[in-house]
Amino acid sequence: LDLSPALMRELAMVKIALVGLQPDAAGKLPSELSGGMIKRAALARALALDPDIVFLDEPTSGLDPIGAAAFDELIANLRDTLGLTVYMVTHDLDSLVSVCDRIAVLGDKKVLLEGTIDDMLASELPWVKLYFRGPRARMIAPRRGKGA
């Protein structure tokens, strides 16, 4: 792309605002930003060229539960508003439920199961069952029995 510096700055400021950062964040070093702000800045950078697909690797890792929920909401809103396809690698069950409509469970160097959260909850595969219905699956527990 052959964009003028002024247009590049304007587009960057639009993306910064889109992810919920204040304009002054543009002039700050990463060391001056919180963990959540760094993640938002990274998301703004990923959106810079208006992609159709965004790849996210553990986007809520290191965030407190409130920050993680806010980031999940941001991802879902951007997905819906911009028509994005989001591929997300995560171990965060809360994020899976909040953001994902399709899930692929990987193990043993292959896809073990692919489907919706309800498909995961209904699975009798031992590892999938333990992961999605085990002791850490508190948020998705209310979904058990709903379509599963």
Regions inferred by a protein language model and the residue ranges of each:
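Conserved ABC ATPase "signature" region
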Residues: 7-24
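A short, surface-exposed alpha-helical micro-motif characterized by mixed small hydrophobic
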Residues: 96-98
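A short, proline-enriched helix->beta-strand linker immediately N-terminal to the Walker B motif
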Residues: 48-52
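H-loop/switch region of ABC-family ATPase nucleotide-binding domains
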Residues: 90-91
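Conserved ABC ATPase signature
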Residues: 29-33, 37
